[in-house]
Structures are given as C-alpha cells and as structure tokens.
Amino acid sequence: MGRSRSRSSSRSKHAKSGKHNKKRSRSREKERVRKRSKSRESKRNRRRESRSRSRSNTASRRERERAASPPDRIDIFGRTVSKRSSLDEKQKREDEEKKAEYERQRRIRQQEIEEKLIEEETARRVEELVAKRVEEELEKRKDEIEREVLRRVEEAKRIMEKQLLEELERQRQAELAAQKAREEEERAKREELERILEENNRKIADAQAKLAEEQLKIVEEQRKIHEERMKLEQERQRQQKEEQKIILGKGKSRPKLSFSLKSPD
C-alpha cells in the first residue's frame, strides 16, 4: 500500500518535473526565436533606412537637374514654349520611377509579411518538435526517473528521521537540565529555610534564656525583699515587746531604742 502511494507520488513528481523541463525547453526555444526576430527586425530597419536614403538621393538629384536646366521661354499666355517634349519625357520618367519605387516597396512589404509568417510557423513547429522530443525522452527515462525519485524520497526520509531524533535528544537534554536547575533551586530554598529556622530557634533560645535569667533576677529580688520585710517585721515586733516591757515596768532601766534599716543587696 505504501509502495503504491510512493509510486503515485513519484509519478506526480515525474509529471511535474516533465512539465518544468517542457517549460524550460519552450522558454529556451522562444528565446532563440526572439533573437532571430530581433535579427530580422534589424535587417528590415536597415532596408527602410536604405530606401529613405535612396528617396532623398533621388529628390536631391531632381533638384540639381532643375537647377542645371536653362529657364524655359514663356509665351504671352504664360505657357512654356520650349523643351515641352523633354519635360513630358522627364515627367513620364518620374512617374515610371515612382511606380517602380512603389512596386519595390510593395515587394519588400510582401517579403516582410512572408518572412514573419514563415518565422511564426517555424517557431510553432520548433516548439511542437521540442515538446514532442521532451515527452519522448521523458517516456524513455520514466523508470530511471522513478528510481531516482524514490531514492531521493528515501534519503529525505532518513535525513528527516535523523533530524527528528536529534531534536528529541535536544529536548530531553533540555528537560533534564531544567529539572536539575529546579532541584538545585529547591535545595537552595530548603537550605535557606533551614538556616532561617535555625536562626529563629537560636534567637528564641537566646530570648528564653534572657527571659529565664530576668525571671531569676526578679525571683531573687522578691526573695530579698521578702527577707527584708521579715527582718523589719521581726525588728518591729521586738521593739514593740521592749516598749511593752518598759511600759509595764518590767525592766529596771529604760533601754535605748535603735532603729536601723538594711539596704537590699
């Protein structure tokens, strides 16, 4: 099935290549015909220039003849009376020259028309002959062209497969590199988070240690204050007892009273 598709595609390619070859052959033949047409056109232009020069030479010759001829005599009625026969012959000769020139121009135009028709017919026949020969040559080389087309198709397939595999390998390498970069980025983020957590834990531990130390200081201060209060209370009670003893006369001599406050450490 694939073989038939490849053959049909090769035939279509073969037909296309045959058309391109025909077009190139036709274009080359048209170029040659165009060059021949230009050559003939230049020849016709040279002929026209030659005719125009001959006409100008004839006119100048006639002017010189008129200037060289003696003036005719004129009668009382204003008519020329001398050399009438020579003038008639001259006029007749001029008419014959005009007719001959006209006939020559007509033949030249006829020849140009015939040459153009021959040129067109030749170009048409050459084009048909070239197309026929190209078609015959393509038909002869049909199998060879098909084999060459199949070879090029297989080569193109191998090249495309190789390029596809290379592209897939490049994509795989790119994906691996991207994955590695993502893993490195995630690892760096984890390390940064761990460092931040460790720093925070250290700060919390330092803060807790400072807080515990402050609490110990506060407890120690409270203990000292409590001890001082107890001492003051004991001293106050002792003094009250002594005052009561004095008041009640239990003692023989009145003791000296002393009050002292200890400053907290």
Curated annotation (Swiss-Prot):
Record's keyword annotation contains Nucleus: yes
Region: Necessary and sufficient for transcriptional regulation, residue numbers: 67-265
Residue spans of biased composition, Basic and acidic residues class: 60-76, 85-106, 229-245
GO biological process: mRNA processing; regulation of alternative mRNA splicing, via spliceosome; RNA splicing
Residue ranges with Basic residues bias: 1-54
Motif LXXLL motif 1: positions: 164-168
InterPro entries: ARGLU1 (IPR033371)
Motif (LXXLL motif 2): 193-197
Cellular compartments per GO CC: chromosome; nuclear speck
GO MF annotations, alphabetized: pre-mRNA binding; transcription coactivator activity
Keyword vocabulary terms for this entry: Chromosome, mRNA processing, mRNA splicing, Nucleus, RNA-binding
Necessary and sufficient for RNA binding: annotated segments: 1-66
Record localization: Nucleus; Nucleus speckle; Chromosome
Keyword Coiled coil belongs to the record: no
Stretches for region Disordered: 1-106, 229-265
Coiled coil stretches, renumbered: none
Database matches in PANTHER family: ARGININE AND GLUTAMATE-RICH PROTEIN 1
Role played: Dual function regulator of gene expression; regulator of transcription and modulator of alternative splicing. General coactivator of nuclear receptor-induced gene expression.
UniProt family annotation: Belongs to the ARGLU1 family.
Domain remark from Swiss-Prot or TrEMBL: The N-terminal region can bind RNA; preferentially binds 5'-CGG[AG]GG-3' motifs.
Protein name (database record): Arginine and glutamate-rich protein 1
Organism encoding this protein: Xenopus tropicalis
